[in-house]
């Protein structure tokens, strides 16, 4: 009976190792997917920005409209400074 329980324990240990390897692989695949999605999101943002700037540069979209939109959207002072916008007042709504 001891011999049978050793086989069962060995089998169980092997299955636990397999599960650990599979779980690690699942985590790696999910991490790669999340990383790729972040890259895709960043690329989409860059392309949208490029399109808007192209429209402003070709006078299809007035620059003052872009600046008004950026003024309304940007909250952090260092982001606002990139566009020559003044810092937001602390009591100013976002």
From Swiss-Prot:
Role noted for this protein: This protein is essential to promote the specific transfer of the plasmid in the presence of conjugative plasmids.
Superkingdom assignment: Bacteria
Subunit text: Interacts with MobA and MobB to form the relaxosome.
Organism annotation: Escherichia coli
Keywords linked to the UniProt accession: Conjugation, Mobility protein, Plasmid
Gene: mobC
Protein name: Mobilization protein C
